[in-house]
């Protein structure tokens, strides 16, 4: 049975992550209070951040941006979108 957490992002009790996503205090906070569903939303948001800012995953600065964006996404008021971001056209 999945470990349940009161998800800070989605505001309800949902299955938690199976492991800490980052080896630091932020990773522990996410593990303790973010659900699998919210993590899936984050992965989509982070892909958008990587593409819009043209970040290189191997660049150490990308890791710092990842942590800042994750902190804002999960625990801040609202996640910031890149200034020139345009959502993709809807399918349908």
Swiss-Prot record:
One of the Pfam families matching this protein, by short name: Iron_traffic
Gene3D superfamilies for the chain: Fe(II) trafficking protein YggX
MF GO annotations: iron ion binding
Annotated TM spans: none
Top-level taxon of the source organism: Bacteria
GO BP terms, alphabetized: cellular response to oxidative stress
Signal peptide: none
Family matches, as InterPro entries: Fe_traffick_prot_YggX (IPR007457), Fe_traffick_prot_YggX_sf (IPR036766)
Gene Ontology CC annotation, any one: cytosol
Keywords, ordered alphabetically: Iron
Function text: Could be a mediator in iron transactions between iron acquisition and iron-requiring processes, such as synthesis and/or repair of Fe-S clusters in biosynthetic enzymes.
Family in the record: Belongs to the Fe(2+)-trafficking protein family.
HAMAP family: Fe_traffic_YggX (MF_00686)
UniProt name for this protein: Probable Fe(2+)-trafficking protein
């Amino acid at each position: 049975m999945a470990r349940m957490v009161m998800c800070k992002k989605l505001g309800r009790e949902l299955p938690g992550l199976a492991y800490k996503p980052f080896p630091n205090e932020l990773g522990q906070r996410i593990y303790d209070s973010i659900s699998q569903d919210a993590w899936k939303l984050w992965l989509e948001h982070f892909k958008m951040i990587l593409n819009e800012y043209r970040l290189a995953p191997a660049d150490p600065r990308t890791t710092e941006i990842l942590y800042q964006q994750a902190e804002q996404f999960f625990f801040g008021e609202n996640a910031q979108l890149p200034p020139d971001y345009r959502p993709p056209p809807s399918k349908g």
